[in-house]
Regions:
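Generic N-terminal amphipathic, Lys/Arg-enriched alpha-helix
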Residues: 1-28
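Short glycine/serine/threonine-rich phosphate/pyrophosphate-binding segments
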Residues: 59-64, 129-136
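Glycine-rich, small/polar surface segments that engage phosphate groups of diverse ligands
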Residues: 43-115
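A charged, well-structured terminal subsegment
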Residues: 113, 176-206
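A short, well-structured juxtamembrane/interface segment
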Residues: 29-47
């Protein structure tokens, strides 16, 4: 059953139902795969690899936010120097590729220039089936890069291309994106947290 499937009497009623959906979506995340995603990111950071993230629309916003929180947050109060790039952020490059080549190639075209052995691609797509995301994931897999996929709905083609698929059970874009945003924050904050001194943790707001 899709959500919503009917009108609600008030915004308060809709909020209650929405938060119920959000709770179920969060609880659907496979904890072992969350640990696997953490291990993948940790290993890349420790060996000096770069994390590339990409997504469209709301997922592009999460990709950009990920670059901020992992890059700035990850090195605050730690000895880590995370290298993180959102492929969704440079509109000049994106529109040039989309206009001259294809919108389907806006991410993979950048990866071909930037990515190196030991890097990681993190894709964000509610459907898991956005063509430009799928092309980037396929290229990364073929080149031996680890791929972490944030997916929702039925997972799409990204499911089979990912080294680690963090799937959210849900069919509402807002609910899935909210959960993807939370997963991004959880990973970013934990990567920082595990490297901080105990005393410093209590002095900081996360």
């Amino acid at each position: 059953m899709t959500f919503p499937d009917s009108k609600f009497a008030s915004v308060a009623d809709y909020a209650v139902a929405y938060f119920d959906q959000a709770k179920a979506a969060a609880q659907s995340v496979d904890q072992e795969k969350l640990e696997a995603a953490l291990t993948c990111l940790d290993a890349a950071y420790e060996r000096g690899g770069t994390i590339y993230a990409c997504g469209n629309g709301g997922s592009a916003a999460i990709s950009n936010h990920l670059a901020c929180d992992h890059s700035k947050g990850g090195q605050t109060d730690t000895d880590l120097k995370p290298k993180v790039v959102s492929l969704s952020t440079n509109m000049e490059i994106i529109t040039a590729i989309a206009n001259d080549i294809s919108f389907d190639d806006i991410f993979v075209y950048q990866l071909r220039t930037l990515a190196e052995d030991g890097d990681v691609l993190l894709t964000i797509s509610s459907s898991g089936d956005s063509e430009n995301v799928v092309r980037a994931a396929r290229w990364a897999k073929e080149k031996g890069l680890d791929v972490i996929a944030f997916t929702g709905f039925d997972g799409g083609r990204s499911t089979k291309l990912a080294t680690v698929n963090l799937h959210v059970e849900g069919d509402n874009y807002g609910v899935v994106e909210d959960t993807h945003q939370s997963l991004m924050h959880i990973l970013a904050q934990y990567i920082r947290l595990k490297r901080m001194d105990d005393g410093t943790i209590q002095e900081r707001k996360f």
